[in-house]
Amino acid sequence: MSAATTSAAGRLTDGELKAREKAARKAEKARQKRIAADEAAERRRSAKAGFANVNNPRRSTLLTVLCAVFAVYCLFPFVYLLINATKTQADFTSTFGLGFGKTFALFDNIATVFSYQDGIFGRWLLNTLLYVVVGAGGATLLAIMGGYALAKFRFPGRNAVFAVIIGAISVPGIALAVPQFLLFAKLGLTNTPWAMIIPSLISPFGLYLMWIFSEQAVPQELLEAARVDGASEFRTFWQISLPLLAPGIVTTALFTIVATWNNYFLPLIMLKDADWYPLTIGLNQWKDQASTAGGQAIQNLVITGSLITIIPLVIAFLCLQKYWQSGLAAGAVKE
Protein backbone atom coordinates (compact mmCIF):
# COMPACT_ATOMS: atom_id res chain seq x y z
CA MET A 1 0.00 0.00 0.00
CA SER A 2 1.43 3.38 -1.01
CA ALA A 3 1.90 6.33 1.32
CA ALA A 4 -0.91 8.23 -0.44
CA THR A 5 -3.28 5.33 0.00
CA THR A 6 -2.33 5.00 3.64
CA SER A 7 -2.88 8.73 4.17
CA ALA A 8 -6.28 8.58 2.51
CA ALA A 9 -7.22 5.63 4.67
CA GLY A 10 -6.14 7.59 7.72
CA ARG A 11 -8.31 10.57 6.68
CA LEU A 12 -11.33 8.32 6.20
CA THR A 13 -10.89 6.45 9.46
CA ASP A 14 -13.82 8.13 11.25
CA GLY A 15 -16.25 7.62 8.40
CA GLU A 16 -15.11 4.09 7.77
CA LEU A 17 -15.38 3.21 11.45
CA LYS A 18 -18.94 4.55 11.58
CA ALA A 19 -19.75 2.33 8.63
CA ARG A 20 -18.12 -0.60 10.41
CA GLU A 21 -20.14 0.12 13.54
CA LYS A 22 -23.32 0.15 11.48
CA ALA A 23 -22.30 -3.14 9.89
CA ALA A 24 -21.54 -4.53 13.35
CA ARG A 25 -25.00 -3.60 14.61
CA LYS A 26 -26.52 -5.17 11.53
CA ALA A 27 -24.48 -8.33 12.11
CA GLU A 28 -25.65 -8.43 15.73
CA LYS A 29 -29.30 -8.18 14.65
CA ALA A 30 -28.72 -10.98 12.15
CA ARG A 31 -27.11 -13.08 14.87
CA GLN A 32 -30.11 -12.51 17.15
CA LYS A 33 -32.41 -13.62 14.33
CA ARG A 34 -30.35 -16.79 13.89
CA ILE A 35 -30.59 -17.46 17.62
CA ALA A 36 -34.38 -16.98 17.48
CA ALA A 37 -34.60 -19.27 14.45
CA ASP A 38 -32.57 -21.97 16.20
CA GLU A 39 -34.76 -21.65 19.30
CA ALA A 40 -37.88 -21.98 17.15
CA ALA A 41 -36.40 -25.06 15.47
CA GLU A 42 -35.63 -26.54 18.88
CA ARG A 43 -39.22 -25.95 19.98
CA ARG A 44 -40.46 -27.72 16.87
CA ARG A 45 -38.16 -30.67 17.58
CA SER A 46 -39.45 -30.78 21.15
CA ALA A 47 -43.02 -30.68 19.89
CA LYS A 48 -42.36 -33.64 17.61
CA ALA A 49 -40.88 -35.49 20.58
CA GLY A 50 -44.12 -34.94 22.49
CA PHE A 51 -43.03 -32.47 25.14
CA ALA A 52 -45.18 -29.63 23.81
CA ASN A 53 -47.39 -31.50 21.36
CA VAL A 54 -51.08 -30.57 21.50
CA ASN A 55 -51.84 -34.06 20.24
CA ASN A 56 -50.13 -35.54 23.29
CA PRO A 57 -51.71 -33.63 26.23
CA ARG A 58 -50.54 -36.11 28.86
CA ARG A 59 -46.86 -35.33 28.32
CA SER A 60 -47.53 -31.61 27.95
CA THR A 61 -49.55 -31.53 31.19
CA LEU A 62 -46.90 -33.50 33.04
CA LEU A 63 -44.20 -31.09 31.92
CA THR A 64 -46.36 -28.12 32.92
CA VAL A 65 -46.96 -29.59 36.37
CA LEU A 66 -43.25 -30.25 36.87
CA CYS A 67 -42.41 -26.68 35.85
CA ALA A 68 -45.09 -25.33 38.19
CA VAL A 69 -43.74 -27.37 41.10
CA PHE A 70 -40.23 -26.15 40.39
CA ALA A 71 -41.45 -22.53 40.18
CA VAL A 72 -43.26 -22.83 43.52
CA TYR A 73 -40.15 -24.35 45.08
CA CYS A 74 -38.04 -21.42 43.86
CA LEU A 75 -40.55 -18.72 44.82
CA PHE A 76 -41.50 -20.11 48.24
CA PRO A 77 -38.57 -18.56 50.19
CA PHE A 78 -39.26 -15.15 48.67
CA VAL A 79 -42.99 -15.36 49.48
CA TYR A 80 -42.14 -16.47 53.03
CA LEU A 81 -39.82 -13.48 53.47
CA LEU A 82 -42.35 -11.07 51.98
CA ILE A 83 -45.17 -12.22 54.28
CA ASN A 84 -43.17 -12.42 57.49
CA ALA A 85 -41.44 -9.08 56.91
CA THR A 86 -44.85 -7.47 57.44
CA LYS A 87 -45.22 -8.89 60.96
CA THR A 88 -44.27 -7.56 64.34
CA GLN A 89 -42.10 -9.77 66.52
CA ALA A 90 -45.17 -10.80 68.53
CA ASP A 91 -47.09 -11.74 65.37
CA PHE A 92 -44.07 -13.59 64.00
CA THR A 93 -43.98 -15.95 66.97
CA SER A 94 -47.75 -16.35 67.32
CA THR A 95 -49.01 -16.77 63.73
CA PHE A 96 -48.62 -19.32 60.96
CA GLY A 97 -45.58 -18.79 58.77
CA LEU A 98 -47.58 -18.11 55.59
CA GLY A 99 -50.29 -16.09 57.32
CA PHE A 100 -50.29 -12.34 57.81
CA GLY A 101 -50.19 -10.88 61.30
CA LYS A 102 -52.67 -8.58 62.98
CA THR A 103 -50.53 -5.51 62.28
CA PHE A 104 -48.91 -4.54 58.97
CA ALA A 105 -45.44 -3.59 60.21
CA LEU A 106 -43.30 -3.73 57.06
CA PHE A 107 -42.30 -0.07 57.05
CA ASP A 108 -41.75 -0.04 60.81
CA ASN A 109 -39.53 -3.12 60.45
CA ILE A 110 -37.52 -1.49 57.65
CA ALA A 111 -36.98 1.63 59.76
CA THR A 112 -35.94 -0.49 62.75
CA VAL A 113 -33.52 -2.54 60.63
CA PHE A 114 -31.65 0.61 59.60
CA SER A 115 -31.64 2.06 63.14
CA TYR A 116 -30.89 -1.08 65.18
CA GLN A 117 -27.41 -1.17 66.79
CA ASP A 118 -26.66 2.40 65.72
CA GLY A 119 -27.52 1.72 62.09
CA ILE A 120 -24.97 -1.06 61.57
CA PHE A 121 -27.14 -2.59 58.81
CA GLY A 122 -26.54 0.48 56.64
CA ARG A 123 -22.79 0.03 57.14
CA TRP A 124 -23.06 -3.63 56.10
CA LEU A 125 -25.01 -2.59 53.01
CA LEU A 126 -22.34 -0.04 52.05
CA ASN A 127 -19.61 -2.65 52.62
CA THR A 128 -21.41 -5.08 50.34
CA LEU A 129 -21.79 -2.42 47.66
CA LEU A 130 -18.07 -1.63 47.96
CA TYR A 131 -17.10 -5.28 47.53
CA VAL A 132 -19.49 -5.63 44.57
CA VAL A 133 -18.52 -2.43 42.75
CA VAL A 134 -14.75 -2.86 43.15
CA GLY A 135 -14.48 -6.66 43.33
CA ALA A 136 -17.19 -7.80 40.91
CA GLY A 137 -16.66 -4.75 38.68
CA GLY A 138 -12.94 -5.46 38.48
CA ALA A 139 -13.58 -9.15 37.83
CA THR A 140 -15.92 -8.28 34.98
CA LEU A 141 -13.42 -5.86 33.45
CA LEU A 142 -10.60 -8.40 33.63
CA ALA A 143 -12.86 -11.11 32.19
CA ILE A 144 -13.80 -8.86 29.26
CA MET A 145 -10.22 -8.00 28.39
CA GLY A 146 -8.83 -11.48 29.01
CA GLY A 147 -11.64 -13.32 27.22
CA TYR A 148 -11.47 -11.02 24.20
CA ALA A 149 -7.68 -11.33 23.96
CA LEU A 150 -7.82 -15.12 24.20
CA ALA A 151 -10.55 -15.29 21.56
CA LYS A 152 -9.12 -12.88 18.98
CA PHE A 153 -5.34 -13.12 19.33
CA ARG A 154 -3.07 -16.11 18.74
CA PHE A 155 0.02 -16.45 20.93
CA PRO A 156 2.22 -19.25 22.32
CA GLY A 157 0.72 -20.98 25.34
CA ARG A 158 -2.88 -20.13 24.46
CA ASN A 159 -4.00 -23.75 24.82
CA ALA A 160 -2.22 -24.02 28.16
CA VAL A 161 -4.10 -20.95 29.38
CA PHE A 162 -7.35 -22.58 28.29
CA ALA A 163 -6.49 -25.72 30.27
CA VAL A 164 -5.68 -23.65 33.36
CA ILE A 165 -9.00 -21.80 33.12
CA ILE A 166 -10.98 -25.03 32.79
CA GLY A 167 -9.10 -26.47 35.75
CA ALA A 168 -9.77 -23.34 37.82
CA ILE A 169 -13.50 -23.58 37.07
CA SER A 170 -13.57 -27.15 38.39
CA VAL A 171 -12.03 -26.15 41.74
CA PRO A 172 -14.69 -24.98 44.24
CA GLY A 173 -13.99 -21.58 45.71
CA ILE A 174 -14.43 -22.86 49.25
CA ALA A 175 -11.40 -25.14 48.76
CA LEU A 176 -9.22 -22.05 48.23
CA ALA A 177 -10.57 -20.07 51.19
CA VAL A 178 -8.15 -21.45 53.80
CA PRO A 179 -5.00 -21.05 51.62
CA GLN A 180 -6.15 -17.52 50.81
CA PHE A 181 -6.59 -16.79 54.51
CA LEU A 182 -3.09 -18.02 55.33
CA LEU A 183 -1.62 -15.92 52.52
CA PHE A 184 -3.50 -12.78 53.50
CA ALA A 185 -2.62 -13.31 57.16
CA LYS A 186 1.10 -13.28 56.26
CA LEU A 187 0.57 -10.11 54.26
CA GLY A 188 -1.36 -8.47 57.10
CA LEU A 189 -4.46 -7.96 54.96
CA THR A 190 -7.00 -9.95 56.98
CA ASN A 191 -9.81 -7.95 58.56
CA THR A 192 -9.49 -5.34 55.80
CA PRO A 193 -11.60 -4.68 52.68
CA TRP A 194 -8.72 -5.98 50.53
CA ALA A 195 -9.30 -9.46 51.92
CA MET A 196 -12.67 -9.40 50.17
CA ILE A 197 -11.82 -7.39 47.06
CA ILE A 198 -8.63 -9.07 45.83
CA PRO A 199 -9.97 -12.68 45.75
CA SER A 200 -13.11 -11.41 44.01
CA LEU A 201 -11.12 -9.93 41.12
CA ILE A 202 -10.47 -13.36 39.58
CA SER A 203 -13.43 -15.09 37.96
CA PRO A 204 -12.41 -18.14 35.88
CA PHE A 205 -15.99 -18.76 34.82
CA GLY A 206 -16.43 -15.13 33.77
CA LEU A 207 -13.21 -15.29 31.76
CA TYR A 208 -14.33 -18.51 30.07
CA LEU A 209 -17.78 -17.05 29.33
CA MET A 210 -16.32 -13.92 27.72
CA TRP A 211 -13.88 -16.03 25.74
CA ILE A 212 -16.67 -18.12 24.24
CA PHE A 213 -18.93 -15.12 23.68
CA SER A 214 -16.16 -13.13 21.97
CA GLU A 215 -15.57 -16.03 19.58
CA GLN A 216 -19.26 -16.08 18.62
CA ALA A 217 -20.28 -12.41 18.70
CA VAL A 218 -17.40 -10.54 17.05
CA PRO A 219 -16.79 -11.43 13.37
CA GLN A 220 -13.11 -11.52 12.53
CA GLU A 221 -13.85 -9.76 9.23
CA LEU A 222 -14.94 -6.61 11.06
CA LEU A 223 -11.70 -6.51 13.02
CA GLU A 224 -9.59 -7.03 9.91
CA ALA A 225 -11.46 -4.28 8.04
CA ALA A 226 -10.97 -1.83 10.92
CA ARG A 227 -7.25 -2.61 11.06
CA VAL A 228 -6.92 -2.08 7.31
CA ASP A 229 -8.61 1.32 7.73
CA GLY A 230 -5.94 2.31 10.24
CA ALA A 231 -7.83 1.85 13.51
CA SER A 232 -5.73 0.94 16.54
CA GLU A 233 -6.46 -2.21 18.52
CA PHE A 234 -7.87 -0.14 21.38
CA ARG A 235 -10.18 1.80 19.08
CA THR A 236 -11.28 -1.38 17.34
CA PHE A 237 -12.09 -2.96 20.68
CA TRP A 238 -13.84 0.13 22.09
CA GLN A 239 -15.95 1.15 19.07
CA ILE A 240 -16.61 -2.13 17.26
CA SER A 241 -16.19 -5.11 19.58
CA LEU A 242 -17.52 -3.72 22.84
CA PRO A 243 -21.08 -2.97 21.57
CA LEU A 244 -21.31 -6.51 20.21
CA LEU A 245 -20.16 -7.93 23.54
CA ALA A 246 -22.89 -6.17 25.58
CA PRO A 247 -25.02 -9.30 26.28
CA GLY A 248 -21.96 -11.29 27.35
CA ILE A 249 -20.73 -8.43 29.52
CA VAL A 250 -24.09 -8.17 31.30
CA THR A 251 -24.20 -11.94 31.84
CA THR A 252 -20.67 -12.02 33.23
CA ALA A 253 -21.36 -9.00 35.43
CA LEU A 254 -24.50 -10.60 36.86
CA PHE A 255 -22.68 -13.82 37.71
CA THR A 256 -19.82 -12.00 39.43
CA ILE A 257 -22.18 -9.61 41.24
CA VAL A 258 -24.31 -12.46 42.60
CA ALA A 259 -21.22 -14.43 43.66
CA THR A 260 -19.78 -11.42 45.50
CA TRP A 261 -23.10 -10.27 46.97
CA ASN A 262 -23.86 -13.73 48.38
CA ASN A 263 -20.30 -14.54 49.45
CA TYR A 264 -20.39 -16.01 52.95
CA PHE A 265 -17.49 -18.30 53.78
CA LEU A 266 -14.69 -15.97 52.65
CA PRO A 267 -15.76 -12.99 54.82
CA LEU A 268 -16.52 -15.40 57.65
CA ILE A 269 -12.85 -16.38 57.94
CA MET A 270 -11.29 -13.13 56.70
CA LEU A 271 -13.16 -10.50 58.74
CA LYS A 272 -13.41 -10.08 62.50
CA ASP A 273 -14.48 -6.45 62.80
CA ALA A 274 -18.27 -6.04 62.41
CA ASP A 275 -17.67 -2.67 60.74
CA TRP A 276 -16.31 -4.52 57.68
CA TYR A 277 -18.97 -7.26 57.53
CA PRO A 278 -21.03 -7.70 54.36
CA LEU A 279 -24.76 -8.30 54.65
CA THR A 280 -24.44 -12.08 54.66
CA ILE A 281 -22.26 -12.19 57.78
CA GLY A 282 -24.09 -9.36 59.53
CA LEU A 283 -27.51 -10.96 59.13
CA ASN A 284 -26.12 -14.30 60.26
CA GLN A 285 -24.82 -12.56 63.40
CA TRP A 286 -28.30 -11.16 64.06
CA LYS A 287 -29.78 -14.61 63.48
CA ASP A 288 -27.42 -16.15 66.03
CA GLN A 289 -28.29 -13.39 68.46
CA ALA A 290 -32.01 -14.06 68.03
CA SER A 291 -31.69 -17.84 68.40
CA THR A 292 -29.34 -17.85 71.39
CA ALA A 293 -30.89 -18.55 74.78
CA GLY A 294 -31.37 -15.23 76.53
CA GLY A 295 -30.73 -13.30 73.31
CA GLN A 296 -32.91 -10.50 72.02
CA ALA A 297 -35.89 -11.64 69.94
CA ILE A 298 -35.32 -9.93 66.60
CA GLN A 299 -36.43 -12.60 64.14
CA ASN A 300 -38.65 -10.05 62.38
CA LEU A 301 -35.61 -7.84 61.79
CA VAL A 302 -33.61 -10.77 60.40
CA ILE A 303 -36.45 -11.59 58.00
CA THR A 304 -36.86 -7.96 56.92
CA GLY A 305 -33.11 -7.53 56.47
CA SER A 306 -33.00 -10.68 54.33
CA LEU A 307 -35.80 -9.32 52.15
CA ILE A 308 -33.96 -6.02 51.69
CA THR A 309 -30.82 -7.96 50.80
CA ILE A 310 -32.31 -9.93 47.91
CA ILE A 311 -34.41 -7.16 46.35
CA PRO A 312 -31.48 -5.51 44.46
CA LEU A 313 -30.54 -8.84 42.86
CA VAL A 314 -34.14 -9.55 41.83
CA ILE A 315 -34.43 -6.09 40.25
CA ALA A 316 -31.12 -6.51 38.43
CA PHE A 317 -32.12 -9.86 36.92
CA LEU A 318 -35.56 -8.63 35.87
CA CYS A 319 -34.23 -5.45 34.26
CA LEU A 320 -31.34 -7.15 32.47
CA GLN A 321 -32.93 -10.49 31.58
CA LYS A 322 -32.97 -9.63 27.85
CA TYR A 323 -29.19 -9.32 27.86
CA TRP A 324 -28.18 -12.22 30.07
CA GLN A 325 -30.55 -14.66 28.37
CA SER A 326 -29.00 -13.69 25.03
CA GLY A 327 -25.53 -13.98 26.54
CA LEU A 328 -26.14 -17.48 27.83
CA ALA A 329 -27.69 -18.60 24.53
CA ALA A 330 -24.89 -17.24 22.37
CA GLY A 331 -22.33 -19.81 23.48
CA ALA A 332 -24.69 -22.65 22.61
CA VAL A 333 -25.59 -21.48 19.10
CA LYS A 334 -23.42 -22.43 16.19
CA GLU A 335 -22.89 -19.51 13.83
Feature annotation, model-predicted:
Residues 60-335:
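A structural signal for multi-pass alpha-helical bundles of membrane permease subunits
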Residues 1-67, 294-295, 321-335:
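Transmembrane alpha-helical segments of polytopic membrane transport and secretion proteins
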